[in-house]
């Protein structure tokens, strides 16, 4: 049989399709491998473990992701997005207030039903998870893959995590009252650090793993633009960012397995969390979409102001119309709004409840599972988001995104 005949055979075609499919799903395959390794050898990559993952991965892997971001983004666009206060308001209000309030209501309803299979501390962990700030690394990686505004995403994760050191403890004090008094951090005698120490730790982590590599990347890009572009395309550094994200999840699962988090709750609770996390992440993603593109704005502000328009219309248009974001910005907000950080989240939980608290493992289960499932779900959604973004390329002028927006949708 000749080579050409073999290539035309059904066996060769089916084998090629299977190999192409497996290559396309490399992220999920490696994720499964890393979870299996974390289960079998949790001491290797847990916090304080063999490789001191809180430094080698917590700082190193995150720094690589933001170094790549610094090398690939325009300094001018970075400054433009830093000034986009409307997007900051949308993401912060969704990430901290809307999501946590909805979860608080759901958890309170489950607690009121007196379901003995769902541990109260697991529900407390659910509330704690959704009071945490948005995740740092996966948001940037996923937004870049979806061809969204990853520069805006970078601004949101930095602002959200800096403020999260203050907002999350305040939210826990607000929610953990009455029927949830048992979970109030003020009643935990094993707390490890004060809010001031937590904030210092957060600023150190964000400074060394986000700001410094981002700054270095920007300097290198502006001094050596051609060489930087060549490196980005030749070495496919975007794939490197995705692999760094896998290492971060490897660390989270290793820490969870080392703390026996998954064996501290019932199988029914784990099954409930797995399906609940996927459903609530999709719900929050859809909710964030409508929050980012309110239909009433287009109905009220159909036309750009002109000389015959009233002052009220002109001022209202200038203030409200930019809240209807273009598609790239919408994708950035959609990925930031529902996401929750495990890196800072673990530090926040440990500082509030104490690393030696016997209930810590149960509290961390929702956080670790949600992080993994949000990344897997977002990895599926990015292809649809990418198609939606490029669908407007076929339209000469997209009235939904170009009029009154702070940012040009073509950027």
Swiss-Prot record:
Bilayer-spanning residue ranges: 18-38, 53-73, 90-110, 121-141, 151-171, 205-225, 243-263, 270-290, 330-350, 362-382
GO cellular component: cellular bud neck; plasma membrane
Effect of inactivating the gene: Leads to modest tolerance to azoles and terbinafine, but not to amphotericin B and nystatin. Elevates the intracellular Ca(2+) and leads to the activation of the calcium/calcineurin signaling pathway.
A UniProt-annotated Pfam family: SBF_like
Glycoprotein recorded as keyword: no
Recorded superkingdom: Eukaryota
Record membrane topology: Multi-pass membrane protein
KW Transport (keyword) present: yes
Chief location: membrane
Extracellular side: 39-52, 111-120, 172-204, 264-269, 351-361
Subcellular locations according to the entry: Cell membrane; Bud neck
GO biological process: calcium ion import; negative regulation of cytosolic calcium ion concentration
Cytoplasmic topological segments: 1-17, 74-89, 142-150, 226-242, 291-329, 383-411
Coiled-coil blocks: none
UniProt keyword annotations, A-Z: Calcium, Calcium transport, Cell membrane, Ion transport, Membrane, Transmembrane, Transmembrane helix, Transport
Role noted for this protein: Solute carrier protein that negatively regulates the cytosolic homeostasis in response to high levels of extracellular calcium.
UniProt similarity note: Belongs to the bile acid:sodium symporter (BASS) (TC 2.A.28) family.
Full protein name: Solute carrier RCH1
Species: Candida albicans (strain SC5314 / ATCC MYA-2876)
UniProt lineage: Eukaryota, Fungi, Dikarya, Ascomycota, Saccharomycotina
